[in-house]
């Protein structure tokens, strides 16, 4: 079995990230940014990009907002894989969580998921995220405000799950 590799993303990866964001159905679940927005995020010092590779082929990405913030809270802003349903997203998520907790002082990682996105929610729960509540109208997608289920994982729970 080939292993997945999580690597730090760079400006050279923007084309792949944008292509993945534009896969059918992803705009409604993941969102998408322009090239200028991605370049600005990469340059602002607040965001960290990660690419997941399988046999030297890019198959997914994640964007973390507030990487190494002084508040010690990181947000998984966006995460996606090119071919869902193969378990790669869950592996990407688990590796990303490990990376955040081992490379930063983060105490809490949180994310928002649309309540109807059962596949993503199951993956988040499998890695240890817990639902905290509904953030009403917190996401503006396709000209509509949408609710998001806030899920989070705190360092003590992550540490306990590793033992």
Residue ranges and their predicted role:
Residues 8-12, 18-84, 90-93, 99-104, ...:
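Acetyl-CoA-dependent GNAT
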Residues 57-60, 119, 145:
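Glycine-rich acetyl-CoA-binding "A-motif" of GNAT/NAT acetyltransferases
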Residues 90, 116-133:
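Conserved active-site alpha-helix within GNAT-family acetyltransferase domains
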Residues 102-112:
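Conserved GNAT acetyl-CoA-binding A-motif
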Residues 111-121, 137-142:
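Conserved beta-strand-loop-alpha-helix junction that forms the acyl-donor binding cleft
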Residues 144-163:
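Terminal substrate-recognition subdomain of acyl/acetyltransferases
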């Amino acid at each position: 079995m080939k292993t997945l590799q999580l690597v730090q993303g760079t400006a050279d990866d923007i084309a792949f990230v944008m292509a993945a964001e534009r896969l059918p159905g992803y705009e409604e679940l993941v969102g998408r940014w322009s090239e200028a927005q991605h370049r600005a995020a990469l340059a602002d010092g607040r965001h960290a990009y990660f690419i997941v590779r399988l046999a030297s082929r890019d198959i997914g990405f994640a964007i973390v907002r507030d990487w190494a913030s002084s508040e010690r809270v990181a947000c998984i802003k966006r995460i996606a894989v090119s071919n869902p349903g193969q378990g790669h997203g869950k592996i990407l998520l688990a590796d990303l969580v490990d990376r955040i907790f081992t490379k930063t002082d983060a105490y809490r990682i949180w994310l928002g998921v649309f309540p109807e996105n059962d596949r993503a929610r199951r993956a988040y729960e499998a890695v240890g995220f817990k639902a905290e509540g509904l953030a009403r109208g917190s996401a503006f997608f396709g000209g509509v405000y949408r609710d998001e289920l806030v899920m989070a994982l705190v360092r003590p729970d992550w540490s306990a799950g590793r033992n």
